[in-house]
């Protein structure tokens, strides 16, 4: 079974007022823990789980990372909120460092205005050949993951009308978005090298494809999602992502070609996902026709169900998806919080509360659906091969 892990980016807010606080560097210096790192702006903080094979181990680690981040932030008078953009106005303070200085110099307002928080899922692959085959086959499904994660309706005090405005703000980077089919690892690396030779990206880390080969670990890194307000939703997206990767790898080994969906169509699907989330109609990844968002999410589940069943994760994935479809995404929760008094501070305080709800791995309502815990991988170090 393939290892997988989650990186989450959080907004740092004042523990009293809820306003964004530029204390990212202070939080990292307080922690002495490599699971916490700085982001482009001081108002952000990133966490990273270890790689795991068992979903319950991943959920426990994710909960520990959120707790670690919030407890450390409290030492400097801040809290962490799983908000993909800031509901309240923010004048970002850049993180110090030569790389960040170069990014700001090159990209101007696009960089200095980029207070956006995403969720990245890593899934182990055997080698670059398998990884690129996976990238080619998962691309039409990625907008569905975005729709399931949508958690950024507000931007600097304004209602954007989007379920994920982060996806719009992030799309201003020239290296961001969906890619054409690569076909081979050689073509993938040639494409990346050609982009670097334009002197637009600062380095490999700025190859912001929706999904890419990670340049440090033997993983496919899926980067399309908002940070999820609910930790359960992050676990669901990780499960679906691993299911997509394994399904794609099996198709490649069986000689099944990727769907030749035009990149422009994938981009339209991503726009719909960001605009409406799970509250409207999405483009079906196979037919590219608008369909009910819930039906499209179920189509994704059906696509990866054989793999989930083989891995013993089908019931927990189905339970998590049912929960999400019933209560809505973080975007819906944010809008509900604002509707009470029309005060964006309520959105932030509710996000802080939900972000830091106590979790014990897979939450109680899903444990009946989850398979029995398999052997522990607590001592597993480093990214393993599948």
PLM segments and residue spans:
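Metal-dependent DNA replication initiation modules
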Residues: 83, 87-89, 98, 103-119, ...
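C-terminal accessory/tail domains of diverse enzymes
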Residues: 1-76, 92, 103, 170-386
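Surface-exposed, active-site-proximal loop segments in enzymatic domains
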Residues: 94-96
């Amino acid at each position: 079974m393939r290892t997988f892990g989650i990186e989450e980016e959080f907004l740092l807010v004042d523990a009293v007022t809820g306003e964004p606080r530029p204390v990212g560097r202070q939080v990292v210096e307080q922690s002495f823990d490599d699971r916490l790192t700085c982001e482009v702006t001081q108002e952000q903080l990133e966490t990273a789980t270890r790689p795991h094979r068992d979903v319950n181990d991943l959920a426990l680690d994710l909960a520990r990372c959120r707790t670690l981040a919030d407890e450390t932030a409290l030492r400097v008078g801040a809290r962490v909120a799983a908000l993909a953009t800031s509901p309240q106005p923010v004048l970002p303070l850049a993180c110090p460092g030569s790389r960040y200085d170069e990014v700001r110099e090159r990209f101007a307002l696009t960089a200095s205005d980029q207070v956006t928080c995403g969720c990245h899922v890593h899934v182990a692959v055997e080698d670059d050949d398998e990884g690129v085959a996976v990238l080619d086959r998962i691309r039409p499904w990625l907008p569905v993951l975005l729709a399931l994660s949508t958690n950024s309706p507000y931007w600097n005090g304004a209602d954007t009308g989007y379920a994920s405005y982060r996806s719009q703000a992030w799309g201003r980077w020239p290296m961001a978005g969906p890619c054409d089919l690569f076909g081979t690892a050689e073509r993938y690396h040639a494409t990346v090298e050609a982009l670097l030779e334009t002197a637009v990206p600062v380095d490999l880390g700025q190859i912001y494809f929706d999904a890419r080969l990670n340049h440090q670990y033997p993983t496919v890194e899926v980067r399309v999602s908002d940070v999820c307000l609910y930790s359960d939703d992050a676990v669901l997206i990780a499960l679906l992502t691993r299911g997509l990767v394994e399904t794609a790898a099996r198709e490649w080994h069986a000689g099944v070609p990727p769907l030749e969906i035009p990149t422009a169509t994938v981009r339209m699907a991503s726009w719909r996902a960001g605009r409406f989330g799970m509250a409207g109609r999405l483009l079906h990844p196979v037919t590219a026709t608008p369909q009910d968002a819930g039906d499209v999410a179920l189509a994704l589940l059906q696509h990866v169900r054989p793999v989930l069943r083989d891995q013993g994760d089908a019931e927990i994935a189905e339970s998590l998806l049912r929960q999400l479809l019933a209560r809505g995404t973080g975007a819906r929760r944010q809008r509900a919080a604002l509707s009470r008094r029309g005060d964006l501070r309520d959105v932030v305080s509710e996000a802080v509360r939900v972000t830091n709800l106590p979790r014990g791995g897979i939450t109680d309502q899903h444990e009946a659906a989850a398979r029995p815990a398999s052997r522990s991988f607590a001592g597993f170090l480093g990214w393993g091969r599948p």
